[in-house]
Amino acid sequence: HTLTGHCAKVLAAKFLGEPTRVVTGSHDRTLKIWDLRSRACVETKFTGSSCNDLVTSDGSGSTIISGHFDKTIRFWDTRTESGSNDIVLPGKITSLDLSRDANYLLSCVRDDTLKLLDLRMKMIVFTFSAEGFKVGCDWTRAAFSPDGQYVAVGSSDGSIYIWSVTTNKIETILKDHT
């Protein structure tokens, strides 16, 4: 399918609870929800800032979390018109990743940190940083390991930094890309 409707770059797309609905985030400052059967946009949410990444936080597809260039993480309920409970971070958000249990959100931030948020409390519970680690561009991506015990991210120096979520300490720095 080709879906048209955004008027700027689309930087994020995720399935929304079922294989027939997709949500997209764009530099046109909107989120769009698409019905793949009709190939049409069924809802547009105006975010106020360029959306760089998004995740869906429940199996039903009713919650969307979006990360923006205005340093804000926004929470959206697809059953209502507007967002709620925004969290402002100290830099542009370059990526979001959701833990397997959907309790934690990992955000990569242009202030050269990763922030771990507890979604039950809607607050930052830890900040990962390291000497030498630099978020090199607006599209740097961070991710949880499949077991949720580690987080990994690439750095502008070509290294991969891996932290333990339990100890909050650097586990290793892989320099094979340098």
Mark where each language-model region is.
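Per-blade loop-tip surfaces of WD-repeat and WD-like beta-propellers in eukaryotic adaptors/scaffolds
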Residues: H1-V10, L16-T20, R29-N52, S57-T63, ...
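Conserved strand-to-loop turn within each blade of WD40 beta-propeller repeats
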Residues: C7, G25-D28, G67-D70, C108-D111, ...
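Loop/turn segments within WD40 beta-propeller blades
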Residues: K14-T20, V55-G61, D97-N103, A143-G148, ...
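Intrinsically disordered, low-complexity segments enriched in small/polar residues
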Residues: S66-G67, A102, G148, S159
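C-terminal extracellular loops and terminal segments
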Residues: G91, D97, V109-R110, C137-W139
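Loop/turn-rich, solvent-exposed surfaces of beta-rich toroidal or solenoidal domains
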Residues: F133-I162
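Non-catalytic, largely sequence-independent nucleic-acid-binding elements associated
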Residues: T178
